[in-house]
Amino acid sequence: MRKSAIIPALIVGALLARVEAGDSSPQLADSLERKVAHLRENGQKARPDPRPTVLTDEEVDAYMNSGRLKVPEGVSDIHLSTTVGEATAVAKVDFDRLLRDVRKNNMLWQLFTGVHDVKVRCGVWGKDGMGNVHVQNVWLDGHEIPRVALEFFLEHYIKPKVPQASLDSRFRMPVRIHTATVTKGKTTLTQR
């Protein structure tokens, strides 16, 4: 299974903790990489080991900022934190870099310029092999964007290019992950 297939599980396992930059970041990113490799290998077995795999917010945060995961150009300084059933992501978004090629095709994109703080809070859970992500709130520079505006933007400008895009996503979790339980500071994944 490709690394990119594990990303939905990481999101469901969600993640988002502010980690102080320090000497432990490479070790934390390595730890997450080993856990992802274990999940992949375990998922290929006829009878996967059902013991849980715990992903800490700190590991996910270190991995997301290590350069090992391809993120869109213009998105940086990603931080994740989890509480019971929720994940919150914060990132710096340079809209000039992110929308460089799209802007010329649509006037609406010209409204987005400069570097901004974007924060997204989601309800996340996984049960019976299905992952669920429900976007609850989105903030731009501390100002909450009304859901109706998010829905309009998604419907008219994102879905034509990415038909599966949604504020409420349900998907089969990869590598035979059966449950994803999100609690304070960690996500626990079990496989079947």
Language-model features: where?
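Intrinsically disordered, low-complexity segments enriched in polar/charged small residues
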Residues: 7-8, 45
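Bacterial N-terminal signal peptides that target proteins for export
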Residues: 1-7
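Bacterial N-terminal signal peptides
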Residues: 8-15
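Extracellular/lumenal and peripheral-membrane lipid-interaction modules
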Residues: 18-192
